[in-house]
Amino acid sequence: MLTITSYFGFLLAALTITPALLISLNKIQLI
């Protein structure tokens, strides 16, 4: 159970962090 919850937690974190990084990179390129 711990491995499954940690896997989903990591997946959720990746899905939330990746768009934030892409948005920050796009803002840097616009400037």
From Swiss-Prot:
Any GO molecular function: electron transporter, transferring electrons within cytochrome b6/f complex of photosystem II activity
GO-annotated biological processes: photosynthesis
GO cellular component terms, semicolon-separated: chloroplast thylakoid membrane; cytochrome b6f complex
Pfam hit, one: PetL
Signal peptide location: none
Homology family: Belongs to the PetL family.
Main function: Component of the cytochrome b6-f complex, which mediates electron transfer between photosystem II (PSII) and photosystem I (PSI), cyclic electron flow around PSI, and state transitions. PetL is important for photoautotrophic growth as well as for electron transfer efficiency and stability of the cytochrome b6-f complex.
Protein name (Swiss-Prot/TrEMBL): Cytochrome b6-f complex subunit 6
